[in-house]
A protein has these predicted regions:
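Hydrophobic alpha-helical membrane segments
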Residues: 189, 209-222
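Conserved acidic donor-binding loop of glycosyltransferase catalytic domains
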Residues: 24-25, 236
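Acidic, divalent-metal-coordinating active-site segment for phosphoryl/phosphodiester hydrolysis
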Residues: 8-18
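Cytoplasmic-side transmembrane-helix entry/capping segments in multi-pass membrane proteins
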Residues: 203-209
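Conserved small/polar residues in nucleotide/adenosyl-binding loops
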Residues: 225-234
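Membrane-embedded transport module
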Residues: 1-3, 18, 25-197
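PDZ/PDZ-like domain micro-motif
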Residues: 14-15, 31, 211
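Generic leucine side-chain signal with a strong bias for well-ordered alpha-helical environments
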Residues: 15, 233-236
Length: 236
C-alpha cells in the first residue's frame, strides 16, 4: 500500500497514482482534487491518527460480526435440535426478536465506543482481498456457538436442572429460565468478542458505555420477567 502527500500542482499525478493520496489543506485546488484525503490541519501526524482510528473501526466491525453470528448460530442451533429432543419452540417469536433486534443493536452501540489501541499500529497492513471474516473469527464463532448450544441443551434436558422448576403447562418456568440463561450467555459472548486475544476484562475502564449497555441487557429482561410473574400471581 503506497501513500503520497503533496500540496502543489506538480504533485497531482503522484497523488492520483498512489493507493491513497493525501493532499494538504493549504495546498492548491488541483492537489486537493487529485488526492483521496485532504489533511485540513496540514500535519503528517494526522495520517497516523487516521490509520489508527480506521483500524479501530475495522476491529469494531469484526467484533460485532463475531457477536452477531455467534448469537444467531446459537439460537438457530437450539431451535433446530430441540424438536428432536422432545422440546417444542424453546425460543418464542418475541424472544427471537429481542435477540435479533435489541441485543444486536445494543451490541453494535457497545462496540462503537471501543477505544483505539496502539497495538493495532503494530499489525501489518490488510490485503485488498482480505475477507472481513477471518479464520480466527470462524473458529471463535464455531467454538462459542457450539458451547452455548451444548449448555442450553443441557439446561433444558438434564434432570438435576429441570427438577428445580415447577411443572407447568408448556414448561413455562423452565423456558423462562432458559431465556434468562441465553441472555447471560449472550453477555458473556459480548465480553469475549470485544477482547480479541486479550484478557476478558481488558480495557473496560476506557469504554464505560459497554458496561452500561451490558448491565441494561441483563437488568431489563430479568426485571420484566419478575414483574410479569408478580402480576400473574396477583391475579390468581
Amino acid at each position: 500500500v503506497t501513500g503520497m502527500t503533496g500540496d502543489g500542482i506538480n504533485d497531482a499525478p503522484a497523488l492520483r497514482r498512489a493507493d491513497v493520496g493525501f493532499a494538504m489543506g493549504s495546498g492548491t485546488q488541483v492537489a486537493k482534487d487529485a488526492g483521496d484525503i485532504v489533511i485540513l490541519d496540514n500535519r503528517l501526524s494526522s495520517i497516523v491518527r487516521a490509520v489508527l482510528y480506521g483500524r479501530t473501526v475495522f476491529k469494531s466491525i469484526r467484533k460485532f460480526i463475531t457477536l452477531q453470528l455467534t448469537m444467531n448460530f446459537s439460537a438457530v442451533g437450539v431451535t433446530m435440535i430441540c424438536p428432536f429432543l422432545g422440546i417444542d419452540s424453546p425460543v418464542t417469536v418475541v424472544q427471537m426478536l429481542w435477540i435479533n433486534l435489541i441485543m444486536d443493536t445494543l451490541g453494535g452501540l457497545a462496540f462503537a465506543g471501543e477505544p483505539p489501541l496502539q497495538a493495532y499500529m503494530r499489525e501489518p497492513p490488510k490485503r485488498r482481498d482480505e475477507s472481513i471474516l477471518n479464520r480466527y473469527m470462524v473458529n471463535e464463532i464455531a467454538l462459542l456457538g457450539g458451547a452455548t448450544v451444548a449448555v442450553c441443551l443441557l439446561f433444558l434436558k438434564h434432570p438435576l436442572i429441570t427438577s428445580q422448576f415447577r411443572a407447568t403447562e408448556g414448561n413455562l418456568c423452565l423456558l423462562t429460565a432458559f431465556f434468562a440463561l441465553f441472555i447471560f450467555s449472550s453477555v458473556f459472548n459480548c465480553f469475549n468478542a470485544r477482547t480479541d486475544r486479550l484478557g476478558l476484562f481488558a480495557g473496560l475502564k476506557k469504554n464505560p458505555v459497554f458496561l452500561g449497555i451490558m448491565l441494561a441487557v441483563l437488568v431489563i429482561p430479568v426485571s420484566y420477567t419478575h414483574l410479569r410473574a408478580h402480576e400473574t400471581l396477583a391475579n390468581l
